[in-house]
Amino acid sequence: MNSGYPLANDLQGSMKNTNYKDWLAMCENNQQYGVNPAAINSSSVSTALKVAGAILKFVNPPAGTVLTVLSAVLPILWPTNTPTPERVWNDFMTNTGNLIDQTVTAYVRTDANAKMTVVKDYLDQYTTKFNTWKREPNNQSYRTAVITQFNLTSAKLRETAVYFSNLVGYELLLLPIYAQVANFNLLLIRDGLINAQEWSLARSAGDQLYNTMVQYTKEYIAHSITWYNKGLDVLRNKSNGQWITFNDYKREMTIQVLDILALFASYDPRRYPADKIDNTKLSKTEFTREIYTALVESPSSKSIAALEAALTRDVHLFTWLKRVDFWTNTIYQDLRFLSANKIGFSYTNSSAMQESGIYGSSGFGSNLTHQIQLNSNVYKTSITDTSSPSNRVTKMDFYKIDGTLASYNSNITPTPEGLRTTFFGFSTNENTPNQPTVNDYTHILSYIKTDVIDYNSNRVSFAWTHKIVDPNNQIYTDAITQVPAVKSNFLNATAKVIKGPGHTGGDLVALTSNGTLSGRMEIQCKTSIFNDPTRSYGLRIRYAANSPIVLNVSYVLQGVSRGTTISTESTFSRPNNIIPTDLKYEEFRYKDPFDAIVPMRLSSNQLITIAIQPLNMTSNNQVIIDRIEIIPITQSVLDETENQNLESEREVVNALFTNDAKDALNIGTTDYDIDQAANLVECISEELYPKEKMLLLDEVKNAKQLSQSRNVLQNGDFESATLGWTTSDNITIQEDDPIFKGHYLHMSGARDIDGTIFPTYIFQKIDESKLKPYTRYLVRGFVGSSKDVELVVSRYGEEIDAIMNVPADLNYLYPSTFDCEGSNRCETSAVPANIGNTSDMLYSCQYDTGKKHVVCQDSHQFSFTIDTGALDTNENIGVWVMFKISSPDGYASLDNLEVIEEGPIDGEALSRVKHMEKKWNDQMEAKRSETQQAYDVAKQAIDALFTNVQDEALQFDTTLAQIQYAEYLVQSIPYVYNDWLSDVPGMNYDIYVELDARVAQARYLYDTRNIIKNGDFTQGVMGWHVTGNADVQQIDGVSVLVLSNWSAGVSQNVHLQHNHGYVLRVIAKKEGPGNGYVTLMDCEENQEKLTFTSCEEGYITKTVDVFPDTDRVRIEIGETEGSFYIESIELICMNE
């Protein structure tokens, strides 16, 4: 074979030894040029294809053929018709060594073969004992034998896989063998899990085995992908690297390694339950990846990167080849060669024809000469081209599975010498690996690209997809149907195909957002033919996401649309928000049908369109879809699900407690966990498990009682309305939200009254008597949704101050469907499956002791700690727990609030709380001293206002200014109200109320004894007759009558008891020239006058005794010039 043309057969070389008789035979067969098929694919590739094909056939295995999948694989890897049993493993090593230009040493080859011989012996013993037991499953000795051999074989397979992965310098060369050993190991573990109950591996041992399977799957995939990519990097970066070698490596390692990895996820019997009649049956896996064969000159004049772009496709939705157009250079009859091509293709279940661009040269001298309609899949192709000069293509044949042949022929005349033929295809026949027949082909043609070398020479590449891919996305009636996301037939502008990580069998679909439009994908599937009117199915999604995202999942059947919303978990994170093409196995999750399901009732033989689109995505959000899975909901599936649910719910309930006696709760068990566990238990079928349900309900009720007894916060679940809490008016206790079990707290936004904000709040003080000294307490709860709600927890200050903004994103778990009996949680599958770990699932907000304030975004669970120091029941510091909303558009729904003991503190925590305690005591001492000083001054001022300690009368010379000053002193008393709430009493509230009441009494007595109405002008000029420019102004917080012009006048007529003496007292000041005056005049024209001038600085108090001769007098205020300010006017009877 010419090393420059690894896919071609040289005509001259094939004819060197022909005689005249051979030549005549060739002429009789009209064979004008050599057709000696080239073995372009190694025998190891054919072997790998047979292994994958054998496993894929177990989607619908022939009845009674084998009892375990391993039995079908072993004869392929250790064929009986070969004199050297290790031939297959030698082929794997030799082929890989050729691909990466590495020689297999005799030691490595011998050692690897020895290891695999031991593996074969263990597997043979296992399959023999398994089949013996399977035929007599009640035979105890057979059961013991198979269990023992299972354990021994599993250990040996694991040991062998680890050995191959750690053989330094040969990790890549041995990778295909490693993949096969990993495959053995996982298929074996699958047997153990399927037969766990009969082998007494149920529950704890079975769970351990399942965890082992998950861990091994993760490790086997990670190792394989790492070394596959290292091989690519080595070939890509070689200084003299050729694309043909690079492509050979990608193609053959995809078949030998990556395709095997793509099967692993389907081995999980808990995700893909084994069929009860035939437990060898597997869920169908589809390989949507494309691999390439090509005719390329060597050495090529283009780089690996350039040829990769020219001869392969960028990522795309899965397509089906429908038409090929060919251009031919037609300028000269003897130079008629292929010059370009174009492709017509369609997406799955789409009748619309899509067209590619033109590949090659279709310009001057080239004409469209062929349009080949492909109404049947092509399983083999051949190219005829010249060998010197090379790559001038004259003919191309397409072998179709319907038995017909389609051809391109440039019709060059005369026929050039030195033609050669290259065959392309994939066969499970090791003797003709690149020349499949209609009976043994594994791939179909999906695309062709032509790339120009020079005027008449071209490179040609063929893209191939595995024949396992279903053209209709047929939905099985008796097995889980997997439909890769790249088989969508519609993506909108913000949905895109991205490169797969290598272990998913193909590429993926990323749903992103530009800030306004979220990505949308649509997949069309076709239901099978069945006799029932309808059948029930559930829809599951395998995905990865970089944050919790709500998805709208819907389907359209016969014009009717149905759907729901579900939510993803956050499964991965990448720097700079790049879209990952290296997702790990463990970064994928399933949205399960029995958690949040799109229930579907489908009719026979109908097309159904399934759509997925995120809601309210930000530009940073990403959801990456691997595949959707459609699960037939049969009675056996439901029964199995009920059984699994019972076991899961038993585990959830057991996880609430610390021991089997169930007399103490785990510290991590929240009150919310207990409520949700109760919801789970209530959904257990009473028909199937009445006793189990009753026992579990009793245990959950016990857990609730234990939760309430350890909670030092009173009424944290609001089942007794607001008992124990102090609240503002706009607090309500509701029970209409299925997120919560029973009552919950609803807080509305703060009230805005004429620009003044009145916060919404609720708080509770935990008395000292309920606490323990030097102890840490957990403060936690559950937020359904909130905006701008502030949590403050305090003992020695604001130890906890958190703002919680939590979106209302749990509706998919808890649809608002109520009937007369309450929320129908069971039918809607409202309860999260992993409720025992809600802190992880719902992104618990925890306190950072290094920060004074924190903001919690998207955290439904919150959990903080607060420490106590020494206790003082007299001081009764306690612990304050408060929720507050200070913005009018804020809101919150809360429940399951608890403060529970975590345990005694020591070390640094103990030192810290003692420091805080001392600091708080020092601050309190300073506050008490400050309070005492303020109190003494205010009390002294108030005492001076009255004639006795009973505050029955004012001193005669008590003025309004003195009362106002006393009021000022009272208002200056500190710490009257709570630091966080301006209308909640603080430490000095009681003494403030006492003194404020005495000031109010003084003011009342003052107003009562003043015969003049509104003499302090607090009611403006009410009661006064005003002319000219006079009004009441607020000056330094005091109402002052101001006269600004000589023409202004203010007067009031007053009724007196004559024959009594009175005192007229005025506090006022004059500014500017002229005088200000206040005159009292009776009806006998007797008058008294108080005069003020600007020579008198500030406000002056002046009095005059008056003895009116009549019972009516007139008070008149005026000025001659300038401004006159009157603070108060009193007329007091001398008998008072």
Curated annotation (Swiss-Prot):
Q: Which GO terms describe its molecular function?
A: signaling receptor binding; toxin activity
Q: Where is this region: Domain III?
A: 467-641
**Biotechnological relevance of this protein:** Whole bacteria have been used since 1977 to control mosquito populations.
UniProt key word Magnesium: yes
* Function, as annotated: A pesticidal protein active against Aedes and Anopheles mosquito species; activity on Culex species is strain dependent. It remains toxic to permethrin-resistant strains of A.gambiae. Following activation of the protoxin by mosquito larvae midgut extract (or by chymotrypsin or trypsin treatment) it becomes insecticidal. Causes mosquito cell death by activating a host G-protein-coupled receptor which subsequently activates adenylyl cyclase and increases cAMP production.
The protein's name in its UniProt record: Pesticidal crystal protein Cry4B protoxin
Segments carrying the region annotation (Domain I) are 84-282
Known cofactor(s): Mg(2+)
The listed locations are: Spore
PTM characteristics? Treatment of recombinant protein with A.aegypti 3rd instar larvae midgut extract for 1 hour yields major bands of 72 and 45 kDa, the combined proteins are toxic to mosquitoes. Longer digestion, which removes the 72 kDa protein, yields a non-toxic preparation. Proteolysis by yields a 65 kDa toxic protein and 48 and 17 kDa fragments which are not toxic.
What does its UniProt record remark on the domains? Answer: The toxic segment of the protein is located in the N-terminus; it is about 65 kDa in size. The first 83 residues are not necessary for toxicity and presumably include the signal sequence. An active fragment (residues 84-641) has 3 domains; domain I is an alpha-helical bundle of five helices, domain II is a beta-prism of three antiparallel beta-sheets and domain III is a beta-sandwich of two antiparallel beta-sheets. Domains II and II pack on top of each other and against the long side of domain I.
- The family this protein is said to belong to: Belongs to the delta endotoxin family.
Found in which tissues? Answer: Host (A.gambiae) larval midgut; binds to host brush border membranes, probably to cadherin-AgCad1 (Cad1, also called BT-R3).
Q: Further notes on this entry? A: One of several insecticidal Cry and Cyt proteins in the parasporal crystal.
Family annotation (InterPro entries):
Cry1Ac-like_dom-VII (IPR048645), Cry_V (IPR041587), Galactose-bd-like_sf (IPR008979), Pest_crys (IPR038979), Pest_crys_dom-III (IPR005638), Pest_crys_dom_I (IPR005639), Pest_crys_N_sf (IPR036716), Pest_cryst_cen_dom_sf (IPR036399)
Cofactor, how bound (note): Mg(2+) is required for toxic activity in insect cells.
Summarize subunit and interaction data from the UniProt record for this chain: In the presence of micelles active toxin forms oligomers that can be fit into cryo-EM maps as trimers. Binds to host (A.gambiae) cadherin AgCad1 (also called BT-R3), probably on the cell surface. Activated toxin may bind its host AgCad1 receptor as a monomer, but also forms an oligomer that is not active.
Q: Which Pfam families match?
A: Cry1Ac_D5, Cry1Ac_dom-VII, Endotoxin_C, Endotoxin_M, Endotoxin_N
Q: What is its main location?
A: other
Sorted UniProt keywords: Magnesium, Plasmid, Signal, Sporulation, Toxin, Virulence
Q: Which GO terms describe its biological process?
A: sporulation resulting in formation of a cellular spore; symbiont-mediated killing of host cell
Q: Where is this region: Domain II?
A: 283-466
**What is the organism field in this record?**
Bacillus thuringiensis subsp. israelensis
The entry summarizes how activity is regulated as: Toxic activity on Trichoplusia ni insect cells stably transfected with the AgCad1/BT-R3 receptor leads to oncosis, cell death characterized by cell swelling, membrane blebbing and depletion of energy reserves.
